[in-house]
Amino acid sequence: INTIHASDQSISVKTQDFMLLLLTFFERNPGIARLLLGDPLVGEAPRLKPRVRQLFDKMETACRQALRRAQSTAFAKPPLSPIAQTALVMQLIEGAVTRYVRSEFAQSPTEHFAEQWPIIEIGLTNADA
């Protein structure tokens, strides 16, 4: 994540890379995906929930910081605040991972991402939206 944010790419490319990194990680680690969505191990639920929350908070913070930096240097004001943009990105990621787990790992979280990205990008960056 830090490598993505440190790159000289546009915020659009960074956001796409961030989303694809997380989706690919969950795709390659289905057991972790299941755990992060609340399927606890026996006796682990009380300890697991705060750790999962902390992990998602860290992902959101990294995304939000990158979006804030990008907006501070952007010429056009995006249609959403960095907080709203981050919420949208995380909801899309969590939704794709939920679908993956619910399908018993048959429907990849990266399936159709390349086709969906242009629409996501417009929603995140289109100043005329």
Q: What residues fall within each predicted segment?
A:
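Hydrophobic/aromatic-rich alpha-helical bundle segments in the mid-to-C-terminal region
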Residues: 33-37, 49, 71-119, 127-129
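Non-membrane alpha-helical structural segments and their capping/turn regions in soluble enzymes
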Residues: 12, 16, 53, 57-60, ...
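Hydrophobic alpha-helical connector segments
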Residues: 1-31, 82-89
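Hydrophobic recognition helices of helix-based DNA-binding modules
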Residues: 1, 26, 63, 67, ...
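Amphipathic alpha-helical packing segments from all-alpha helical-bundle domains
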Residues: 28, 46-73, 83-87
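Short helix-capping/turn signature of helix-turn-helix
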Residues: 37-44
